[in-house]
Amino acid sequence: MAHHKSAIKRIKQNAKKNARNRHISSTLKTYIKRVREAVEAKDKEAATVALKAAIPVIDKTATKGVIHSSNASRTVSRLTKLVNTLG
């Protein structure tokens, strides 16, 4: 256990950040999963709706620094490409 006051504070801050980041990451994965499931079911309408819901979540996750902005762009691009294959 840390002895310095600043180290104790850092441990608390890191625990808070970790919990917040885990929640955001989990939410992000759920939205991505919904898009992929709709595509697997070959439901163009549901996939489009799921994608429109997922894009702001992906962008917000990148803005908060949980994922890198390039990762967010790549994910959006791949999901959009996937939905567009349904024609």
Swiss-Prot record:
It holds the Pfam family Ribosomal_S20p. One of its GO terms (cellular component) is small ribosomal subunit. Residues 1-22 are annotated as: Disordered. The keyword rRNA-binding applies. Keywords: Ribonucleoprotein, Ribosomal protein, RNA-binding, rRNA-binding. It comes from the Bacteria. The keyword Protease does not apply. GO terms for biological process: translation. One of its GO terms (molecular function) is structural constituent of ribosome. HAMAP family: Ribosomal_bS20. Binds directly to 16S ribosomal RNA. Belongs to the bacterial ribosomal protein bS20 family. PANTHER family: 30S RIBOSOMAL PROTEIN S20, SMALL RIBOSOMAL SUBUNIT PROTEIN BS20C. This is Small ribosomal subunit protein bS20. The lineage of its organism: Bacteria, Pseudomonadati, Thermodesulfobacteriota, Desulfuromonadia, Desulfuromonadales. The gene is rpsT.
